[in-house]
Amino acid sequence: MDIESVRLWATMGTIMIGTIAPAIAIALIGSKAADAIGRNPEAAPKVQTAMILAIAFAEAIAIYALVIALIIKFV
């Protein structure tokens, strides 16, 4: 395997792992938020605020993975 093949595989692995984990986290956050709102509808604004913040933090991991993959690919 030459260096370009290794870079390609490293880029693919980084993107795969870096997007699967946040997707699972966002799904779990959404399901738990829906459960919480279903049990206590009056707390919906607080739950939604916390949910959006948690989703933003989870999505940041995917953005970091994208940046790392681009560095691997082009540097």
Predicted ranges, named:
Residues 1-75:
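Hydrophobic alpha-helical transmembrane segments of small proteolipidic membrane proteins, enriched
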